[in-house]
UniProtKB/Swiss-Prot annotation:
Family: Belongs to the GET4 family.
Keywords for the protein's UniProt record, in alphabetical order: Cytoplasm, Transport
Acidic residues bias (residue ranges): 307-317
GO CC terms of this entry: BAT3 complex; cytosol
Full protein name: Golgi to ER traffic protein 4 homolog B
Quaternary assembly: Component of the bag6/bat3 complex.
Primary location recorded for the protein, binned into one broad class: cytoplasm
Domain of life from the UniProt record: Eukaryota
Pfam families (alphabetical): GET4
GO biological process: protein insertion into ER membrane; tail-anchored membrane protein insertion into ER membrane
């Protein structure tokens, strides 16, 4: 009986809190609608810290999220970005479990920010770091997917590709690359767009996405004739490579790399990627030098990381973030 009464009182208290937040939110909205942006912004900040000090983390986060959206709708991007940072602060301090809804909310705020603002860079960095509480060492793959799609819509293909590589969305990555290649690339390099992506996915030990991005890209690109076999030697190489990775036979991998050396020389990074793929999937030992030298080595080390544990599941990242060239 006492427990039931306590639960009932708790429900009433929760309802009162929600009602109080809604009333406050209504007043703040009215202030913004009148154009009192500075006053409203300061009031949002005051309420945030008050709620946080009272351990009302959910109320604080929801109020900042709705406030950020409100400021964005009135083209007050600086105030909106500031409240967006407070949303992250509430997540960080409360140690909230990563959920798809929260990731969608963060991606929504990201999509509304000025693409060229330093606030956006800081926001995405903190959001990815917070999301590591879920899956993936370098940010939740789902958040990477949401970010990649936003950047793709903005035609920022360079950064979109980076985030797709750290997602599990091989199909989305392929569709973006088709658009990227068709709008920005040379016809003679139509094969190189997907070859780089496949090799990088494999270096991240994501066989599934590597296969999906290759199949989707070669089927949908208007300048690629249906295969296999393909007109472009590099595409045939990748097709054979994906089969070899599934088989795991070192002799097949070695002969394949030897036979396609003329085509692989089109990009000096290809053989560096293949060295790593040989270690991950075919049991090859690392090179004698513990790290690769020169500019290419810096790029590869940033892609692969150093001294990491190779015993990971397909699709789980075991490297540092990729530097894309």
């Amino acid at each position: 009986m006492a427990a039931a009464m306590a639960e009932q009182e708790g429900s009433k208290g929760s309802a009162r809190n929600r009602g109080g937040v809604q009333r406050v939110e209504g007043k703040l909205r009215a202030s913004v609608e009148k154009g009192d942006y500075y006053e409203a912004h300061q009031m949002y900040r005051t309420l945030f810290f008050r709620y946080m000090s009272q351990s009302k983390h959910i109320e604080a986060r929801e109020l900042m999220y709705s406030g950020a959206l409100l400021f964005f709708s009135h083209s007050q991007r600086n105030s909106a970005a500031d409240l967006s940072m407070l949303v992250l602060e509430s997540l960080e301090k409360h140690e909230v479990k990563v959920t798809e809804e929260l990731l969608e909310n963060l991606a929504k705020l990201f999509s509304l920010m000025d693409p060229n603002s330093p606030e956006r860079v800081a926001f995405v960095s903190r959001a990815l770091k917070w999301s590591t509480g879920g899956s993936g060492k370098f940010g939740d793959p789902k958040l990477h997917q949401f970010l990649a799609i936003t950047l793709w819509k903005e035609q920022n293909y360079y950064e979109s590709r980076y985030h797709f590589l750290h997602s599990s969305d091989g199909e989305g990555c392929a569709n973006m690359l088709v658009e990227y290649s068709s709008s920005r690339g040379y016809r003679s390099e139509v094969d190189m767009f997907v070859v780089q992506a496949v090799l990088q996915f494999l270096c991240l030990k994501n066989k599934t996405s590597a296969s999906v991005v290759f199949t989707t890209y070669t089927q949908k690109h208007p300048s690629i004739e249906r295969g296999p076999p393909f007109v472009q030697p590099l595409l045939n190489f990748i097709w054979f490579l994906l089969l070899a990775v599934e088989g795991g036979k070192l002799t097949v991998f070695t002969v394949l790399c030897e036979q396609y050396q003329p085509s692989l020389k089109r990009d000096p990074m290809y053989n560096e990627y293949l060295d790593r793929i040989g270690q991950l999937f075919f049991g090859l030992p690392p090179k004698q030098s513990s790290s690769y030298g020169g500019l290419l080595g810096n790029l590869l080390n940033s892609l692969m990381g150093s001294g990491e544990d190779d015993d990971v599941e397909d699709g789980q990242e075991d490297s540092s973030p990729i530097e894309l060239d």
